């Protein structure tokens, strides 16, 4: 067994060592070296700005609700029929629309003899359609950020199902998928809602991203006071993407705290276009763009310009602090 000397000098090293003790006790000595290396790497990355791109999913990255690309058909219903029944449950019980659709999925799958295990949700997720350019989008933006000295991270903040999103072709692109999910029994089958995310619950994940907290369960660290300089992703470094009015609380918070909110819309659906224009007119978002994520799109142009602005402001602030 080797000994560990935590008595380094310097404010930064003391901070590293404070975290190191915790990591050592949690991980054990064999994993300690890897853990402390990762910690030092994270602190090093803070020398360059981290920009968080946070996306709603349904209607934002995909042209429809994820349940409409295989699951609803598998239970023998039409999308309109399924959502009407879900709304009736919510209205009749004065219940959450999110918990109502999760219950309906569970009940209808059981009637149809369909098992709902993680792998089953992922299989349905693999059929979810995406807007033009979405698959290539992450590589394009990551590369642009790298060329500007910026680290880009991607997050999902959705009222859809995390398990289905995990089955999509783009799941690996996200640092964290914040979304609804089920609790599973010993046989691996869904038996109860584990996380339900409605339009106001979404806002908590902005503050978790802000402080670098990836756990859904955590309700302590996210509420602890933290100096602005220590927050992993400042709000001005956030870009929020959403298609509708259910994302308004998140869009408004990000915009209010100096970040940028983008209302994306399907140009083929007039109602979606009108909603986006309304949000811009009401100053709830900074920009509106068609749901096109190709390199030639307005979305790409807007996001690259925001990244440029973030980097310039970051460099100016650092110069102002230097002697």
Name what the model sees in each region:
Residues 30-33:
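Short linear segments in intrinsically disordered or otherwise low-structure-confidence regions
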Residues 125-155, 159-323:
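C-terminal cap/substrate-recognition subdomain and adjoining C-terminal extension
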Residues 5, 13, 22-25, 42:
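Intrinsic-disorder-associated, low-complexity terminal segments enriched in Asp/Asn/His/Tyr and depleted
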Residues 20, 35-38:
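Ala/Thr-enriched low-complexity intrinsically disordered regions
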Residues 7-10, 35:
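Short, low-complexity, intrinsically disordered N-terminal modules
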């Amino acid at each position: 067994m080797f000994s560990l000397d935590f008595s380094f000098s310097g404010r930064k090293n003391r901070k590293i060592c404070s975290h190191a003790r915790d990591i050592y006790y949690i991980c054990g000595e064999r994993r300690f070296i890897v853990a402390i290396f990762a910690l030092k790497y994270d602190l090093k990355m803070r020398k360059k700005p981290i920009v968080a791109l946070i996306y709603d999913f349904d209607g934002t990255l995909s042209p429809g609700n994820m349940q409409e690309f295989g699951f609803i058909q598998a239970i023998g219903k039409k999308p309109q029929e399924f959502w009407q029944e879900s709304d009736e449950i919510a209205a009749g019980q004065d219940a959450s629309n999110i918990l109502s659709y999760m219950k309906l999925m569970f009940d209808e799958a059981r009637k149809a003899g369909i098992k709902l295990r993680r792998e089953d949700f992922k299989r349905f997720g693999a059929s979810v359609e995406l807007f033009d350019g979405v698959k290539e989008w992450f590589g394009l933006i990551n590369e642009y950020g790298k060329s500007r000295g910026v680290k880009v991270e991607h997050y999902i903040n959705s009222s859809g199902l995390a398990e289905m999103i995990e089955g999509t072709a783009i799941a690996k692109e996200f640092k964290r998928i914040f979304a609804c999910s089920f609790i599973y029994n010993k046989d691996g089958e869904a038996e109860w809602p584990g996380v339900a995310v409605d339009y106001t619950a979404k806002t908590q994940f902005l503050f978790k991203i802000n402080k670098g907290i990836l756990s859904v369960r955590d309700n302590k660290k996210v509420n602890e006071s933290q100096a602005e300089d220590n927050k992993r992703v400042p709000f001005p470094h956030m870009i929020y993407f959403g298609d509708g009015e259910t994302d308004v609380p998140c869009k408004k918070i990000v915009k209010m705290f100096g970040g940028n909110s983008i209302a994306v819309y399907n140009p083929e659906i007039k109602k979606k276009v009108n909603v986006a224009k309304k949000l811009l007119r009401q100053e709830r978002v900074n920009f509106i763009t068609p749901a096109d994520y190709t390199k030639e799109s307005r979305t790409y142009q807007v996001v690259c310009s925001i990244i440029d602005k973030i980097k310039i402001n970051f460099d100016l602030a650092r110069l102002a602090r230097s002697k």
